[in-house]
Amino acid sequence: MKSAKKLLSVLCLGIFILTFTACDMVEKTPEAKAKSTIAKVNGEKIQRKDLDESPNMQQVLSQIKTQYGEEFEKTEQGKEVIKEQKKQILENLITEKVLLQKGKELKVIPKDEELNKEADKKVNEIKAVYNNDEKKFEETLKSTGFTKETLKEYLKDQIVIEKVINEVTKDVKVEDKDAQKYYNENQSMFTEKPNTMNVSHILVKTEDEAKKVKKRLDAKEDFAKVAKEVSQDTGSKEKGGLLGDISYSDSNYDPTFMKAAIALKSGEISNPVHTQWGYHIIKINSKKEYPVKKFDSVKEDIKKQLKQEKQQEAYTKKIEEWKKASKIKTYEKNLL
């Protein structure tokens, strides 16, 4: 099972991320179900087997079986969960189909000899994950529904998709001034060590409640005592509102909350801060801040990051444009 998950994980990295015929009373054979059309993209069919045999779908089914047991997918709840997952994966397959069609249009598909050579190289890279153990590799292929031939065909498609994406994003550039601007606006991200702050807060529903809390604190009432009385954050209330040490770059907290907290000095208490959770009164118990690295030492890393972000934006914009211009029809009734 671990080997299968490892292969699926490797294969799924290549996917950018990076649908009534006859009589319903007649149940289709497994072969007929596999060949049933779940989508058409500019006249080209996507069959159910394309979805069911995809690495993403295999990974989803593996996770569902591990988490909920072998019988879950047979239940009504399981069928609904799987159908929703299939709809998402079908959207990926539609995107891939559009990209493959554009590969022909843009003339970026390599000649057969070169494409086979690149695919063989990727196969060897996957084998290396298994220390070139041929038996283990073949067992894993079998457990994930692949043969050597279907794996190679899948990889050839991914190579073409990668070339289309490269074509779309080839003109993306980032100037030094862009990196300098990002550096100036995000200096807390480039310290010698991660900056941290020890934070407490009191969470209430309304602004009026928050103002009353702030008034009590301004009158020198104990923060922890007030938090235990009125805070609606059950996770920190009994600890006097203590959240503990938080890195300045922690993405688990609301960005508005983080911005307000970072702006405070040690010992300071904020005015009411509104987030999706309600109104916070934030207290900074202490801070550990470190020197900022010189711009020249982080410039190339910043440019690389910004380039990747711009490439993703360019790709997303282009694929949305292509899909909008395509004739796409899905057949969700054929997903299960």
Swiss-Prot record:
Residue positions bearing lipid (N-palmitoyl cysteine): 23
Transmembrane spans: none
SUPFAM superfamilies from the UniProt entry: FKBP-like (SSF54534), Triger factor/SurA peptide-binding domain-like (SSF109998)
Location relative to the cell: Cell membrane
Domain PpiC: 194-286
Cellular component terms (Gene Ontology): plasma membrane
Top-level lineage group: Bacteria
Organism ancestry: Bacteria, Bacillati, Bacillota, Clostridia, Eubacteriales
Signal peptide residues on this chain, from the entry's feature table: 1-22
PANTHER family in UniProt: FOLDASE PROTEIN PRSA, PEPTIDYLPROLYL ISOMERASE
Keywords, in A-Z order: Cell membrane, Isomerase, Lipoprotein, Membrane, Palmitate, Rotamase, Signal
EC number: 5.2.1.8
Family per record: Belongs to the PrsA family.
One protein family per Pfam: SurA_N_3
Annotated function: Plays a major role in protein secretion by helping the post-translocational extracellular folding of several secreted proteins.
GO biological process: protein folding
UniProt-listed NCBIfam families: PRK00059.1
Catalysis performed (reactions): [protein]-peptidylproline (omega=180) = [protein]-peptidylproline (omega=0)
Stated name of the protein: Foldase protein PrsA
Record GO terms (molecular function): peptidyl-prolyl cis-trans isomerase activity
Topological category with respect to the lipid bilayer: Lipid-anchor
Lipidation sites (S-diacylglycerol cysteine): 23
